[in-house]
């Protein structure tokens, strides 16, 4: 028999267990509308949760750890974000959910960072993130971001403005000019106050996998070195610290490799362009297809790559000279301005001057490239050096600088118009469609960049055509033509009209899309292999979206200019402008 003491102890134990369960229920009641998902833990020993089965004690301990210092409102905010990231609504976030969410919910954070973010959220490498792990990540990240914000807020007014952003970035070795600092502030600012508070800063950077400000600023600051088959006039900017750490040469190597592969893959377009520039006229009408057949019949498939070797070889010296000159010119301008940052116009001038210097240095290779592209089968049987010696013997040193003047003059309109139209399109987009953001998303930016580059080529193409004709003047088989720039302009205008200045422009445009795409992919691969940190505005997964975007933009620009702005606005391209409020919609 059970004595009274044992019965009393049993009754007392049951009462204590009941009180514990009631206390646990009270703790769980803070979940609000979600308590029904957790309260079944009070009855069975094991219950199904998002990651299988856990014990009641473990679940309650998890809840206590998670909600010990969190308000119900904060919990609701995090739960709302979690539900939005859970694309397939299965109660967990996996790599597919996160990748899709980054693309559609937070385009300012590249989707190629999804694996890094997943590793931060789920350090156990389980491949799935439950609500507790996500909440822990958010709370920890917010704390780190709060400390970072406090460091930036120099006057302790709870706001970070452009001046504070510039000063802090300068202190950590990543100086910003006024334009870039303003861009970063405007990107995070949701109220139009020209400053950022802690809440805006945390919301904007909530999912970014690094809490180090240098990484964050580098992430915004860099632009990809994309080779579109034409020579870029404005080199990339690098901070003093990046120069010391050797990041600059890795970017240049990646850009050079990307350019080499891109130019080799699109060499047939380039040869067709050069051939049409020199040989097409009113009396000798040639189109892309007729030129394609003619070149193939004369030399076969291999003939389409004539001149490509020297076109690739000149990438290295041209890039190196341009970069060194640009860096020295910036230093000279900075020395005269003191502590004031270099403006966009000054960078344009420095870049154009650096481009002119580099072009002057490697211009003989440019002339040889044109001559080699126009040669017939059997005309280069003893190598490039012998070919250059033959040119020198027959025409003298001046032959290596034929067409130099139009080439030099063409640099200014190309670089200036490219930059001006890019900024104009971007501002127009922001003014009409992005009221709370200073810059569109990656697809709209690529569309703007493609079209600004197209306009730059349109403006400078007559100079490029005259340059090519002057370079090939001694080997042309047609009637004698003027051997000066102004004489060529007059000759073309009188004999062929305005359209004569745009011979060969079709293959020039056709090569833009494959050139950009190939260069982008190769650049990303080489940069990653060299250990350069990810700091671009997108990843390889954006390529398949960029292709139709760019093609459509070019077609719209030429044939439907009035509707072009509607295209880049995201209506025709179906670019969802969800980035305008970042994560503010999660708190509605």
Swiss-Prot record:
Ca(2+) 1 binds at residues 86, 88, 90, 92, 97. Residues 1-14 have a biased composition (Polar residues). It is a multi-pass membrane protein. GO terms for cellular component: mitochondrial inner membrane. One of its GO terms (molecular function) is ATP transmembrane transporter activity. Keywords: Calcium, Membrane, Metal-binding, Mitochondrion, Mitochondrion inner membrane, Repeat, Transmembrane, Transmembrane helix, Transport. It comes from the Eukaryota. Residues 73-108, 109-139, 140-175, 176-211 form the EF-hand domain. Ca(2+) 2 binds at residues 153, 155, 157, 164. The chain crosses the membrane at residues 252-269, 307-326, 352-365, 403-422, 446-463, 504-523. It is found in: Mitochondrion inner membrane. The keyword Nucleotide-binding does not apply. One of its GO terms (biological process) is ADP transport. Homodimer (via N-terminus). Belongs to the mitochondrial carrier (TC 2.A.29) family. Mitochondrial and calcium-binding carrier that catalyzes the calcium-dependent exchange of cytoplasmic glutamate with mitochondrial aspartate across the mitochondrial inner membrane. This is Putative calcium-binding mitochondrial carrier F55A11.4.
């Amino acid at each position: 028999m059970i004595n009274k003491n044992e019965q009393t102890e049993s009754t007392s134990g049951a009462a204590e267990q009941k009180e514990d369960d009631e206390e646990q229920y009270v703790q769980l009641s803070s979940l609000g509308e979600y308590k029904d998902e957790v309260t079944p833990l009070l009855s069975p020993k094991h219950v199904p949760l998002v990651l299988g089965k856990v014990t009641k004690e473990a679940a309650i301990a998890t809840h206590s750890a998670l909600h010990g210092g969190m308000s119900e409102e904060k919990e609701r905010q995090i739960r709302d974000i979690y539900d939005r990231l859970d694309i397939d609504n299965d109660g967990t976030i996996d790599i597919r959910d996160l990748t899709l969410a980054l693309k559609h919910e937070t385009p300012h954070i590249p989707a190629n960072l999804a694996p890094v973010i997943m590793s931060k959220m789920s350090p156990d490498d389980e491949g799935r993130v439950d609500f507790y792990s996500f909440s822990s990540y958010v709370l920890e990240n917010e704390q780190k971001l709060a400390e970072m914000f406090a460091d930036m807020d120099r006057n302790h007014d709870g706001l970070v403005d452009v001046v504070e952003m510039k000063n802090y970035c300068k202190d950590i070795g990543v100086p910003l000019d006024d334009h870039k600092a303003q861009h970063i502030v405007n990107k995070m600012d949701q109220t139009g106050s020209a400053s950022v508070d802690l809440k805006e800063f945390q919301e904007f950077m909530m999912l970014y996998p690094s809490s180090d400000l240098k990484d964050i600023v580098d992430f915004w600051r860099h632009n990809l070195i994309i080779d579109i088959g034409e020579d870029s006039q404005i080199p990339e900017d690098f901070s003093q610290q990046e120069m010391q750490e050797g990041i600059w040469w890795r970017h240049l190597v990646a850009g050079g490799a990307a350019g080499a592969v891109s130019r080799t893959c699109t060499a047939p377009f380039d040869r067709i362009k050069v051939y049409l520039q020199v040989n097409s006229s009113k009396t000798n009408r040639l189109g892309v297809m007729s030129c394609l057949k003619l070149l193939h019949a004369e030399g076969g498939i291999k003939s389409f790559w004539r001149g490509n070797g020297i076109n690739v070889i000149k990438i290295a010296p041209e890039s190196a000279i341009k970069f060194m000159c640009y860096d020295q010119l910036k230093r000279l301008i900075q020395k005269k301005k003191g502590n004031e940052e270099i403006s966009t116009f000054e960078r344009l001038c420095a870049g154009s001057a650096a481009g002119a210097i580099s072009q002057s240095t490697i211009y003989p290779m440019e002339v040889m490239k044109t001559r080699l592209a126009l040669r017939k089968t059997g005309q280069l049987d003893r190598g490039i050096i012998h070919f250059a010696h033959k040119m020198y013997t027959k025409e003298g040193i001046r032959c290596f600088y034929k067409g130099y003047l139009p080439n030099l003059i063409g640099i200014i309109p190309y670089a200036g118009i490219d930059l001006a139209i890019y900024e104009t399109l971007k501002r127009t987009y922001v003014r009409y469609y992005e009221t709370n953001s200073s810059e569109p998303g990656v697809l709209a930016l690529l569309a703007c960049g493609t079209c600004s580059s197209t306009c730059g080529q349109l403006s400078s193409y007559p100079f490029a055509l005259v340059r090519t004709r002057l370079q090939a003047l001694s080997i042309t088989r047609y009637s004698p033509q003027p051997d000066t720039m102004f004489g060529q302009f007059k000759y073309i205008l009188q004999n062929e009209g305005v359209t004569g200045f745009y011979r060969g422009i079709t293959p020039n445009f056709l090569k833009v899309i494959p050139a950009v795409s190939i260069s982008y992919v190769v650049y990303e691969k080489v940069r990653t292999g060299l250990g350069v940190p990810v700091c671009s505005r997108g990843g390889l997964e954006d390529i398949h979206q960029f292709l139709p975007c760019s093609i459509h933009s070019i077609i719209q620009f030429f044939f439907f200019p009035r509707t072009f702005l509607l295209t880049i606005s995201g209506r025709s391209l179906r670019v969802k402008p969800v980035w305008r409020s970042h994560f503010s919609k999660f708190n509605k």
